[in-house]
Amino acid sequence: MAWVPIKARLVSLAGDLVSLSITDVKRLLDKAGIAPKKSLGQNFVVDPNTVKKIVRLAQIKSNSRVVEIGPGLGSLTLALIDTGAEVSVVETDGALIPLLTEVLNGGARIVHADARTVDWQDLAPGKGWDLVANLPYNIATSLVIELLDEVPSVDRMLVMVQREAGERIAAKVGDSAYGAVSVRVALRAKATVVGSVPPSVFYPKPRVTSVLVAVERHKQMESSNEVTEEMIRLLRQSFGQRRKMLRKSLTGVTTPESFTLSGVKPSQRPEELDVKTWLRFAEANLKVRKS
């Protein structure tokens, strides 16, 4: 069968969002003589209903400015472009750039870079950016935290991640997945698991179930940089020994006065404290250390 350019076959009809089918993906990969890289977590979305769901949950509109991390071959990107939004994509795999360029046909800015090292001030200047990403398990939580800490221009995110990672990002006090990651995310944003994505919508099919996590940045920070850094220090030490009571896990870095001043009980364990309590504890510990 003769190759028909992707751009000649992808149109938006009756409100249906454009996307790449599994046939499109296989043909593009075969044409380039490449295969999905497991090391990069390359599982391409090939289900139009999933693409539509992601765009809807991300609340992308015609006046949105969107960064997509890990566009792959551009299936979701096409749907983002179709909304009329301004779209930039960051792809780390150089082998996909020519294919992505063909598929998108000038509809989005393509940046060949690693999202962990890209110049975000150039990529997403100012305020009010949305971010959509399909993140590999090994970088998902660290990248979400890095974006919240260091890229204030991104107001909202919708990330597709392995279920276990998504549960950690969005966990609240009392949830089994609640940990240091949950606290650090809650410091700067509200995170909610808003959907599940089965393996069947990807090519190739992963062995895990993914979830969609919506992350909306708080309008104001609740602490100074100094208190935040102290909280992170306490989180790392306490959650590294999460089954121990705080008076044991934080021996040498806190004092009885820190507990008294903050109202935190020495017998509590780290997963019992929400982000506001952690901030109060960190602030008290700093005050005692300086006195």
Task: Identify the residue ranges that each predicted region occupies.
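Catalytic cores of RNA-modifying enzymes
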Residues: 2-237, 280-286, 290-291
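An accessory alpha-helical subdomain
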Residues: 208-217, 223-257, 265, 270-276
